[in-house]
From Swiss-Prot:
GO biological-process terms attached to the record: translation
The family this protein is said to belong to: Belongs to the bacterial ribosomal protein bL12 family.
UniProt keyword terms in alphabetical order: Ribonucleoprotein, Ribosomal protein
PANTHER family, alphabetized: 39S RIBOSOMAL PROTEIN L12, LARGE RIBOSOMAL SUBUNIT PROTEIN BL12M
Gene: rplL
One Pfam family in the UniProt entry: Ribosomal_L12_N
Protein's name in the database: Large ribosomal subunit protein bL12
Quaternary structure annotation from Swiss-Prot or TrEMBL: Homodimer. Part of the ribosomal stalk of the 50S ribosomal subunit. Forms a multimeric L10(L12)X complex, where L10 forms an elongated spine to which 2 to 4 L12 dimers bind in a sequential fashion. Binds GTP-bound translation factors.
Keyword Ribonucleoprotein: yes
GO CC terms: cytosolic large ribosomal subunit
Lineage: Bacteria, Pseudomonadati, Thermodesulfobacteriota, Syntrophia, Syntrophales
Function: Forms part of the ribosomal stalk which helps the ribosome interact with GTP-bound translation factors. Is thus essential for accurate translation.
GO MF assignments: mRNA binding; structural constituent of ribosome
InterPro entries associated with the record: Ribosomal_bL12, Ribosomal_bL12_C, Ribosomal_bL12_C/ClpS-like, Ribosomal_bL12_oligo, Ribosomal_bL12_oligo_N_sf
Domain of life (superkingdom): Bacteria
């Protein structure tokens, strides 16, 4: 039984995956097991809307940095996207050419602002949501 894979082994393997590989893994798991990773979020949103009148709105703590365009400096934007995300050249190029697409999701306000600044310095446009 020494050949069994532990949870720690799975987590270590997942840590080494790129964002694109993780996205494909999530889609595969959703299809294979007939579930949706977005379902808990939808339930939380409905519950949050019901309780919103009673409680003041909470400050948003997680933001998405969405690449909306690359201007005339596509190569420079690809280089910055690679540096930020750790993606390979092809994956970063596909992300940039497929804009609008998220560069990073669920990051702090400071990190999202930093990403926006770096992309805009090389001529791209980013929207923080």
């Amino acid at each position: 039984m020494a050949d069994q894979i532990t949870k720690e082994d799975v987590v270590k393997f997942i840590e080494g995956m790129t964002v694109l590989e993780l996205s494909e893994l999530v889609k595969e798991l959703e299809e294979r097991f007939g579930v949706s990773a977005a379902a808990p979020v939808a339930v939380a949103a409905v519950a949050g809307a019901a309780g919103e009148a009673a409680a003041p709105a909470e400050e948003k703590t997680e933001f998405d940095a969405i690449l909306t365009g690359f201007g005339d400096q596509k190569i420079q934007v690809i280089k910055v996207v690679r540096a930020i995300t750790g993606l390979g050249l092809k994956e970063a190029k596909d992300l940039v050419e497929g804009a609008p697409k998220p560069i990073k999701e669920a990051v702090s306000k400071d990190e999202a602002a930093d990403i926006k600044k770096k992309i805009e310095e090389v001529g791209g446009t980013v929207e923080v949501k």
